[in-house]
A protein has these predicted regions:
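Active-site substrate-binding loop specific to GH73 endo-beta-N-acetylglucosaminidase modules
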Residues: 1-253
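Short, intrinsically disordered, charge-balanced linker/junction segments flanking boundaries
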Residues: 258-263
Length: 263
C-alpha cells in the first residue's frame, strides 16, 4: 500500500545508514570526492587551507542530508535561503556572528548564494587551480541540473592561451570561442558558467576579475536569459521538471549500479 510504503521510506531516511547515501550518491553527484585531491594555487588564493577544504565538503553533505531527512522539496537543491557553516566557512562566505568549529544551520544574509550550485564545493571542483572555468561550471549545470548531455569537445582544438588573450576571463573566452571548432561546445556551456563568475575558483564572492567589473549575464539552452547567480537560480527553478527528472535518473542509476536503458 502506498501509505505503508511512505512510512517505511521516511523511517529509512531517518536511519543512520542515510550517511552512506550522502557519502556515495552526493559524493558522486556533487563531486565531493574529487575535492580531497584538488590543489588550488595558494599563491593566488592565500586564504586556502585544509580546514576550509574540510568545511566546504561538510557543508554540502549536511545540506544534502537535511533535504533528504527532513523531507524538504528537492527544489531546495536549486535555491534555498539557508545553508550549514562553521566559523571557517562563514568567514569564507562573509556570514557574520558564527563562532566555533561546530556546524549549524544559518539563514543566508543575501541572495548571492542558495542551493548547491552556489556552494563552494561545486564552484571549487569545477574550477582550475588558478582561475575559474566557465566551461567546466557550465558543463556541470548542463548535465547535473538540466540533465542534458554535453557535446564532446572537437578533436585537436588548442587550449585557451592565457598569455595571448587580453581582458577578463569572459572576454578571453569569447575570443577563444571565435574559433568555429570551439564554438559548438562553448556556445552551449559557457553562457551557463558565466552566471557563476561572481565566485572565484575557491567559491568566494567577488565583484571584479583582475580589476575589471564582472559580467555575470548568461542564457539557458532554451534562450532564457539571466544576469547573475540570483537570477540564474530563478530561471533554473522555472525548469523544475527537467531537474526533477535529472535527479530521479541519477538516483535510479545509483541504486541499480548501471546506466539506464530506454526501450
Amino acid at each position: 500500500k502506498p501509505a505503508v510504503l511512505d512510512v517505511q521510506i521516511k523511517r529509512m531516511l531517518k536511519a543512520p545508514k542515510v550517511a552512506a547515501l550522502t557519502e556515495n550518491f552526493a559524493g558522486q553527484w556533487l563531486m565531493l570526492r574529487n575535492i580531497r585531491s584538488l590543489s588550488p594555487d595558494t599563491g593566488t588564493f592565500r586564504t586556502w587551507d585544509e580546514p576550509l577544504r574540510a568545511a566546504i565538503i561538510r557543508e554540502s553533505e549536511l545540506f544534502f542530508e537535511h533535504v533528504v531527512q527532513e523531507d524538504r522539496s528537492v527544489l531546495e537543491f536549486l535555491d534555498a535561503d539557508y545553508t550549514f557553516v562553521n566559523d571557517r566557512l562563514s568567514y569564507h562566505y562573509g556570514i557574520p556572528n558564527v563562532r566555533g568549529r561546530e556546524f549549524r544551520k544559518v539563514k543566508l544574509p543575501d541572495d548571492h548564494r542558495g542551493g548547491v550550485v552556489t556552494q563552494a564545493s561545486v564552484l571549487l571542483v569545477t574550477s582550475n587551480p588558478n582561475r575559474t572555468s566557465p566551461v567546466k561550471r557550465g558543463k556541470w549545470v548542463y548535465e547535473n541540473i538540466l540533465g542534458l548531455t554535453a557535446p564532446p569537445p572537437a578533436p585537436d582544438v588548442p587550449q585557451l592561451e592565457e598569455t595571448q588573450l587580453k581582458g577578463t576571463l569572459r572576454q578571453r573566452m569569447e575570443q577563444h570561442r571565435s574559433n568555429p571548432a570551439c564554438a559548438t561546445c562553448h556556445a552551449k556551456l559557457d553562457p551557463l558558467g558565466f552566471g557563476l563568475e561572481n565566485f572565484d575558483a575557491i567559491g568566494k564572492w567577488r565583484d571584479k576579475d583582475e580589476g575589471h567589473a564582472i559580467d555575470a549575464s548568461g542564457v539557458l539552452p532554451d534562450g532564457a536569459k539571466f544576469d547573475g547567480p540570483a537570477q540564474m537560480r530563478k530561471v533554473l527553478l522555472a525548469k523544475a521538471d527537467l531537474f526533477r527528472r535529472c535527479l530521479a535518473e541519477k538516483l535510479l542509476t545509483f541504486a541499480l549500479g548501471r546506466g539506464l536503458e530506454y526501450y
